[in-house]
Amino acid sequence: AFSDLTDQPMFNWTEETDPLPNLHALQKDPHALSGHIVVPGFAGGTANTEFDALTGMQTNALSVTATSAMRVVNRNLDSLFRVFGADGYRTSFYHPGDAWFYNRENVYRWLGAEHEVFAKDMKDLEYKGRWVTDDYMAGLIEEEFETAVSEGRPLFNYTTTIQNHMSYTADKYGEGYVFPPVSTTADISPDTRSMLEVYTEGVRDADAMLGRLTAYFAEREEPVV
């Protein structure tokens, strides 16, 4: 789960407390394009966003009854995997979760991903609380890029991380974990504030992942989007 919390006027962020310094630095880069993305659901339905982004189709237009686009797909479909694959790219999907969830193991094959890598395929998983860390996934993306380079091929990789998955309870990262406070203009309950602090910590780690990957690819000769 990720969003730019600095877009919301109810928060009192400062330069020191900004949870997204890497994102904001990247937005100011003269070569960067930035904006807002509208996703097909709120607080759930991750696979629907994946489907929309990869196919250009809209989950909301597929079925009035289906809760997930992935449960509607049952055959080969055009997607970015096929577009890039046709141009000789190595294409891959990474997700540190269960392959059966949202039927991803079949759907990504139907979407044309050359390689699918799930938690069961990964070694020495690193966790922060219950979920695999974003930093661990950044390392796998770097390794996948190196593999593509060694093959003499460009790479299209789509990774769905999981660290900031719900729930956002105070014990998410273990008893005694101290979350940086989140200052707001609104009067909110202690429970709501606690959830915000937990969620923001995950957003902060996602931004750190972005910073790591930006620094890594900035040192590469190959052009990277």
What is each stretch, according to the model?
Residues 1-225:
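Solvent-exposed soluble domains appended to multi-pass membrane proteins
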